[in-house]
Structures are given as structure tokens and as C-alpha cells.
């Protein structure tokens, strides 16, 4: 079974070293680079360039949702074979800590992330870049898979839904294999 390894690093030199170490792992079919959401375009471009310089494997770049449209073209120009739209959005809530409310921030997962992802997927698809588009975020149903494909994705990633229903990716793949495109 082919494996795509997800990597996340803020430092191009360290990322390059990691890519060089894992590049020849048997069964590894590709790499996915998660770009830092609090970084900038120059850093994103540098990370993609360094990673692609170290490998012959296809590199997918997972874009932060807020920057997806703005960074997509630069990622492809730097060597990305595919774009993953995208990373989970960030949220916050207030929790008591030693009698005082403090903010707790983190990634938001679940079906409600789908609409946010789909909006960015549509925007990136409109750029008509020469790469694969992979939808990721809030996909829990076959109908959502169809919507992502209709919006321009060639593939989907199932993230948090597998925590709740581990068999879901296989079920969706079977449905996909026997289905017709949305609208037919």
C-alpha cells in the first residue's frame, strides 16, 4: 500500500534534511508539506523549493485556509505537484485557569469546517493551476465528496471523520468507484 508522509517544519534547512532522510523509504509514494499558517509567502516558497530539491517524489503542499488562494500559485511555481486545501481553521474559547478566564486556541475539526474549505477550494480551482487539487476539511459524507469534486478537486482527504468512523474512507472509496459524477 503506498504511503504519503506528512511533514511540517518552519526551517527550510531542517526540512531539507528530513526529506533527504525519508525520501528512499520503501513504499513511500509522496510527501505532503504542511505550511505554517502564521508564516509568510517568502517562507512558504522557500520551504516548498527546499523540499522539492531533495526528492523525486511528488510533493503535495497543504495550504492554510486563510492564505490558500494567495499562496497556491507560488507553491506550484516552487515545485508542488499538488495542493491540499486545506489546513483546519483556528478557533478559540475561554477556559477558567486559576480562577481567571484564559483563551485556548487550536484547530477546528468537524463537519462545519467543510463550508470554509469548499469556499477556498473554489477560489484555488479558479486559478486553473497545473497541479492536482486535493480537498481536505470537514468531509464526512458522500455528498460532501461529490461537492468537493464538483468544485475542482481530483481527490479528497478524510481527516477527523476517521477518528469517529475508522471505516469511512473505505466506504467513501467504494461509493466513489461505483458512482456517477454529481449532476448526471
List each language-model region with its residue ranges.
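Active-site beta->alpha loop and helix N-cap motifs at the rims of alpha/beta catalytic domains
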Residues: 1-42
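Short beta-strand/loop segments at the ligand-binding rim of alpha/beta enzyme cores
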Residues: 1-5, 52-64, 124-136
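Glycine- and other small-residue-rich loops at beta-strand/loop junctions that grip anionic moieties
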Residues: 7-8, 40, 61-64, 109-113, ...
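Catalytic cores of alpha/beta
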Residues: 13-21, 66-81, 122-130, 139-158
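Surface-exposed amphipathic alpha-helices with a cationic face
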Residues: 23, 48-56, 76, 121-128, ...
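Glycine-rich phosphate-binding active-site loops on the catalytic face of alpha/beta enzymes
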Residues: 29-37, 82-92, 138-139, 144-172
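Glycine/Thr-rich beta-alpha phosphate-binding loop at enzyme active sites
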Residues: 33-43, 72-131, 168-171
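Extended, intrinsically disordered, low-complexity segments
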Residues: 114, 170, 174-184
Amino acid at each position: 500500500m503506498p504511503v504519503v508522509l506528512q511533514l511540517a517544519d518552519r526551517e527550510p534547512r531542517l526540512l531539507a534534511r528530513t526529506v533527504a532522510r525519508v525520501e528512499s523509504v520503501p513504499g513511500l509514494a509522496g510527501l505532503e508539506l504542511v505550511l505554517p499558517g502564521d508564516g509568510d509567502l517568502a517562507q512558504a516558497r522557500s520551504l516548498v523549493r527546499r523540499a522539492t530539491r531533495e526528492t523525486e517524489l511528488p510533493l503535495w503542499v497543504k495550504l492554510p485556509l486563510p492564505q490558500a488562494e494567495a499562496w497556491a500559485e507560488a507553491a506550484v511555481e516552487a515545485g508542488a505537484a499538488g495542493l491540499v486545501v486545506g489546513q483546519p481553521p483556528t478557533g478559540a474559547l475561554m477556559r477558567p485557569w486559576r480562577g481567571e478566564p484564559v483563551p485556548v486556541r487550536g484547530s477546528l475539526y468537524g463537519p462545519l469546517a467543510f463550508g470554509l474549505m469548499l469556499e477556498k477550494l473554489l477560489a484555488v480551482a479558479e486559478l486553473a493551476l497545473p497541479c492536482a487539487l486535493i480537498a481536505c476539511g470537514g468531509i464526512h459524507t458522500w455528498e460532501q465528496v461529490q461537492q468537493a469534486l464538483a468544485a475542482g478537486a481530483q481527490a479528497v482527504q478524510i481527516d477527523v471523520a476517521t477518528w469517529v468512523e475508522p471505516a469511512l474512507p473505505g466506504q467513501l472509496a467504494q461509493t466513489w468507484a461505483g458512482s456517477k459524477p454529481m449532476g448526471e
